[in-house]
Amino acid sequence: MHSKNNTILKMIKGEEVTHTPVWFMRQAGRSQPEYRALKEKYSLFEITHQPELCAYVTHLPVDNYQTDAAILYKDIMTPLKPIGVDVEIKSGIGPVISNTIKTVQDVEKLGQIDPKRDVPYVLDTIKLLTEEKLNVPLIGFVGAPFTLASYMIEGGPSKNYHFTKAMMFRDEATWFALMDHLVDMSITYASAQIEAGAELIQIFDSWIGALNAVDFNYYIKPSMERLIKGIKAQHDVPIILFGVNATHLIEEWNNLPIDVLGIDWRTTIKETSDSGVAKTIQGNLDPSLLLAPWDVIQPRLDKILDEGMQHGKHIFNLGHGVFPEVNPDTLKQITAYVHDYTKRK
């Protein structure tokens, strides 16, 4: 039995490592032929609700690509249905919600989550992976309050988040009631994942880039602080915060009690480091480059890895998720290249 590869945890703690750790957002499913074969037999609902299937999909990229972490194959919407949100994942669209939040009474109708009762299949998947002696740390995750709220108010993905921002600006009572409810839910859900065996938590804030720094500080930051501190009060595990198009919020994020700051491809690790970030930085290859030839990918990798080693604490990842069209061999090649290029002498 090989000893466990804890490189990602060591990197975050500032301990000595043999190489820069690698994992990919959306590494589980989508681009993998084994997953596509599974989808011919089972629906997405069946895969996510059957722990054996879900654990298999979660484990695949660790076996196939040799990544330094696994991320649970779930969706950020998972805890919403149990609290009374009528959400469906529609192909080609994403999450669609029919009972949108419009008033404080709508928020008051939402229930509380009990993970053991409401999402036992999530916890059973994590336990199964732990029992199978997954050789790398497992990342659990939650959606950030703003991103979850935007889905619940808009009814689905949005280009401008007009309804979400309008509620923020004109109905603070409803807005902060919704924030509080989502923070409570996410603390409970994240804690249950950790108790089942997750060793890190990533907070996905996909749509936070819609806000400027002033509005983030007033309408969002207190909720984010309460979420992060709430998880850490119960469990001493590293927390990664990742957002899209949020370069202008790096200073605000750096002041949050997170351990890892995840960046997209719109900035650089050097710029992030130079702005005063001393935490571990995660990122940040443009996922579109995965469709490019290797001679285009390699110099971009070199730059990211050089800047990461200069910064000192770096987890290699993409600037967003893996596309379904990506060749799995490319991910395998990148992982091997990162491990080799960053091998500590």
Swiss-Prot record:
It catalyses: uroporphyrinogen III + 4 H(+) = coproporphyrinogen III + 4 CO2. It comes from Staphylococcus carnosus (strain TM300). This is Uroporphyrinogen decarboxylase. NCBIfam families: hemE. Substrate binds at residues 26-30, 45, 75, 151, 206, 320. Keywords: Cytoplasm, Decarboxylase, Lyase, Porphyrin biosynthesis. GO terms for biological process: protoporphyrinogen IX biosynthetic process. Belongs to the uroporphyrinogen decarboxylase family. One of its GO terms (cellular component) is cytosol. Pfam families: URO-D. GO terms for molecular function: uroporphyrinogen decarboxylase activity. HAMAP family: URO_D (MF_00218). Catalyzes the decarboxylation of four acetate groups of uroporphyrinogen-III to yield coproporphyrinogen-III. The record marks 75 as: Transition state stabilizer. Homodimer. It is found in: Cytoplasm. The keyword Endoplasmic reticulum does not apply. Pathway: Porphyrin-containing compound metabolism; protoporphyrin-IX biosynthesis; coproporphyrinogen-III from 5-aminolevulinate: step 4/4. It comes from the Bacteria. The gene is hemE. Its EC number is 4.1.1.37.
